């Protein structure tokens, strides 16, 4: 064990430390964190929609049976959507969803540019605008496809005029751009990360090189600050615009479609492999063992790959609710290749770890705390355990990780690494076998275990059972090591 620890300290820890302090990755992590208010607002909207429309019909189905329920006329299905106030709240939630999850890609674009510009020490507001403009500049005009399909002949011109007449009533026109919603939601993440970074870095480098318009001191600071960003912003947007134009001419396709097809989709396909999930789970524990915040170090991976998949599930859940999710899974629509009418469910997303494996924080340490309270004979451990219980309920485990400590503790490293791996295997298998719904909703990470899984799966009662099973198994894994620690002197573990 000492040899493995020494090897990790020599080769792995320096790499992890560099990753954790690399400004681009830190900016990416902060970008995802900054989006939490919008993400959770969208999650609340989805929960309200489920309570109003899904729960009543689910109760009715349980009472009548699936066969009898399927024969009901639509107006006979229970719902609260037509109830005064509650129905209005549901409609308001739809608007909230439209302003959050439907355009989460735009929110991320601004957050990414803002935090990346801040990392370079330049005007962060302008950086957010540059990144957002970069995304819009590369979006294909869907309206152009309609007009191109109509043709330029006499009939085509007449059809286009008729189309303009219909669109004009909505304040639209065939010559105006129309963007696909799939390019505005989580599907835009990879394009924003790549092209947004390129544009903002160009902007930042020019700002740092002082290639700017300087105003007299008499000009108000806000105006002077805006003028400083003009030349770098124009240069950055024209450079990415040129890239978009050249790639479009060479491939007859848009950059966002190419990035999605050749970069995003392969990563997301790999992410649904159980081995990929286990590798990330293990590395989170390994980084924590050396005192590095595992989820933060791996945030670009966790939030960059599994995060968008969670948002996709969330958006789908808002539309089809729990039964629709189950129907898609039952029909094998668990990846894009097997999508039904473009819809598919991701079995494992970012929130799956919080719901089914990281109870009380990474390593399932809430069960460690309980094991210490019940079985530890060490006074120092019991003190830390009692102090760590309340924070642990809300998934804050730093008092335990550094107070016992678990960090650099050779005895505790084994259960700290193994327990979440076992939990992930059980949860992934249960989800794949349709024994529990996948995570379809964003839940604050401080939500206590059991409640977290119940809410995250769209209030699937089976998630409660699965969580309790995993908690018991995690507890059983921790107990022998807590008992073994009793036999060691305090100095041997310090």
Curated annotation (Swiss-Prot):
Topology term for the membrane? Multi-pass membrane protein
Q: In Gene Ontology terms, what is one molecular function of this protein?
A: protein-N(PI)-phosphohistidine-sugar phosphotransferase activity
What does its record list under induction? Answer: Induced by growth on cellobiose. Negativelly controlled by the CcpA regulator.
* Superkingdom of origin: Bacteria
User: Gene deleted: what happens?
Assistant: Disruption of the gene abolishes growth on cellobiose and lactose.
A GO biological process this protein is involved in? phosphoenolpyruvate-dependent sugar phosphotransferase system
Q: Which residues cross the membrane?
A: 32-52, 92-112, 119-139, 188-208, 227-247, 274-294, 355-375, 406-426, 463-483
Q: Which GO terms describe its cellular component?
A: plasma membrane
For the keyword Membrane, the answer is yes
Q: Which PROSITE patterns match?
A: PTS_EIIC_TYPE_3
Quote the Pfam families the UniProt record gives: PTS_EIIC
Question: Keywords, A to Z?
Answer: Cell membrane, Membrane, Phosphotransferase system, Sugar transport, Transferase, Transmembrane, Transmembrane helix, Transport
Q: Where is the PTS EIIC type-3 domain?
A: 8-481
Domain comment (free text): The EIIC type-3 domain forms the PTS system translocation channel and contains the specific substrate-binding site.
Report the protein's function. Answer: The phosphoenolpyruvate-dependent sugar phosphotransferase system (PTS), a major carbohydrate active transport system, catalyzes the phosphorylation of incoming sugar substrates concomitant with their translocation across the cell membrane. Involved in cellobiose transport with PtcA and PtcB. This system can also transport lactose.
Recorded protein name is PTS system cellobiose-specific EIIC component
List the top taxonomic levels of the source.
Answer: Bacteria, Bacillati, Bacillota, Bacilli, Lactobacillales
- Which gene is this protein's source? celB
